[in-house]
Amino acid sequence: MDWPIMQIQSLLLKPMFKMKSLLVAGLMMSGFVFGQRINSDTLKVAHDDGLIVYANKPYPLSKKGQVFAFFGWNRGAFSNSDIHFTGNGYDFQLNNVSARDRPTKLGIVYIDPSWFTVVQYNFRAGYFIKDNLALVLGIDHMKYVMNQNQTVDFSGTISDPKYAAMVQNGQVNLADEQFLTFEHTDGLNYENLGLEKYKNLVHKKNVDLIWSYGAGLGFMFPKSNVKLFGNDRSDRFHVAGMGTDLRSSLNLVFWNHWMIRAEAKAGYINMWDIKTTLNNKPDKARQDFVFGQVLAGIGYTFNTKKYN
């Protein structure tokens, strides 16, 4: 080969070898850097054949298999209702009866575990059965108190002349507590199972804002405090009916685990077997009403899949 031609080829090949060396070094460095990032931000799954698969790290309250638990406190409101009473010697209805909740005065009872059932509280435990969809077990401990200072419409019959005489012009005044005291204060317990859909609204390094909405269905397990016609007060737990609700919440999650939850819900309660005496007589009451509730509290969420 002609010597000038060989010199030209040599001059052309030297830069190409240098570029190839730089490219290989760059690829090795980028592989190291991105490999380190994968280990810290992704899920690593090893297979039997030695292949390692990397999956994106999921947001909190978003992925199948995630779990959360929550405890909080509520305020409730109730529509007026008709309450029908039946028993030995009476069958009557009080119409358009008003009621309210009974929140406990702010104090140590809200954080003392030995007193937690005294306050109006909520508990939730949720499991994500698929991405962004959770099955949620809930206990809503509300308190329902009939307003004593009211006069209500009366229809029906009472055989006892003492209490029949308290009905004047188709109405009865409840203010003196002689005719009736009626409350579910230990409490108006709504044990429910719900489905909730979750959507991540804001995702930052250590903070997530997540919106959820859903519906629930359950049974009513109140401890009703009822005193009718001076009888012994009924005060016992009993499955009295059913309830259903629609709910929506905002969840602030910090460092992927700790959460603050604020929720609003509206629902319907129908109780057809409220015990009104301590014995096993057929004395009972029934009522149905619409309720609203706002609640807030703290919780914790975690993944059942582990990260590197």
Walk through the language-model features, giving the residues of each.
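Extracellular loop and loop/strand-boundary signature of outer-membrane beta-barrel proteins
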Residues: 55-57, 108-111, 177-183, 228-237, ...
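Bacterial Sec-dependent N-terminal signal peptides
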Residues: 1-44, 308
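Outer-membrane beta-barrel translocator domains and adjoining extracellular loop/strand segments
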Residues: 81-87, 148-154, 223-232, 273-281
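Flexible, solvent-exposed coil segments and beta strand-coil junctions
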Residues: 98-106, 169-177, 224-230, 274-279
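Gram-negative (and chloroplast) outer-membrane scaffold detector with strong preference
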Residues: 60-65, 124-227, 299-304
